[in-house]
Amino acid sequence: MGKDNASYLQAFILVGSSDRPGLEKILFAVILIFCILTLVGNTAIILLLVMDVRLHTPMYFFLGNLSFLDLCFTASIAPQLLWNLGGPEKTITYHGCVAQLYIYMMLGSTECVLLVVMSHDRYVAVCRSLHYMAVMRPHLCLQLVTVAWCCGFLNSFIMCPQTMQLSRCGRRRVDHFLCEMPALIAMSCEETMLVEAIHLCPGGGSPPGAALPHPHLLWRDCSRGAEDEVSSRAKESLPHLLFSPHSGLSLLRNHHLRVPEAGQQLLPRSGEVPDSLLHHRHSQHQPPHLHFEEQGCEGDHEETSGVGERGWGASTRGTL
């Protein structure tokens, strides 16, 4: 840390939209409503997933983790944000800013990896549906979620010190509503291209990773000539396909705009509940191209599905 940052114990000033008090009141009301909806909605999802044994499946296990991430996002951002919008005090302590940056980056990185995991889970559910429950075992799903959280911790552990050690030439005004990495980088008075490139690499790869399986699924259905399946798959893939480019553009935009949109991370995310891709247990409920006689798996389907479902029923009661 440079000598000009020796006064690091001084509080940062979160500028936000403090020059427009009328806008602050509107933002306060809107963000408060979305915070309440986020807290109530995600809490209800988690409780439902825990209490209903029928939802102890891989897809809903990942969904429960995503809901928990949303709750953590809201808890780490909303209190300070609402405090700044609702009162004259616009400051945040140095240590509070570091903690907010670390938690924000950790949760954001974890969510990026988790969305990629959820997308490929849907890929396995469609393309290997007869063996889905055998492939996506509880132990594997728990490992994937653990990897997502570890990636988030690692990325935040690497990037936070690099961001806070940038020379700021005594600047204390953060041109944002919270201590986010692009806003803190914008305060620096030294070259930041390397830090920005490192920041962009982990998040920039997740939108293509999450969107990659869906064009393949649509192309496979088109090649089979199943019009109903193409229409159904398009509806199911649309949330992921819309969310992925939006995430990538948001990463690029944050490096050029000084004041990102207020409460952006507090809005409910699309693509969280791809519930129309549930794995069906009986062949008569499956689309024509997934019938056993066409897959050549008449003998092992019941055994494979039974083992997978028994494994989830016994193993997820303690994890969901």
Swiss-Prot record:
Belongs to the G-protein coupled receptor 1 family. Odorant receptor. The chain crosses the membrane at residues 30-50, 58-78, 98-118, 140-160. Disulfide bonds join C97-C179. This is Putative olfactory receptor 2W5 pseudogene. One of its GO terms (cellular component) is plasma membrane. The gene is OR2W5P. Residues 290-304 have a biased composition (Basic and acidic residues). Glycans are attached at N5. It holds the Pfam family 7tm_1. One of its GO terms (molecular function) is olfactory receptor activity. Keywords: Cell membrane, Disulfide bond, G-protein coupled receptor, Glycoprotein, Membrane, Olfaction, Receptor, Sensory transduction, Transducer, Transmembrane, Transmembrane helix. Gene3D superfamilies: Rhodopsin 7-helix transmembrane proteins. It is found in: Cell membrane. It is a multi-pass membrane protein. Residues 267-320 are annotated as: Disordered. One of its GO terms (biological process) is detection of chemical stimulus involved in sensory perception of smell. It comes from the Eukaryota.
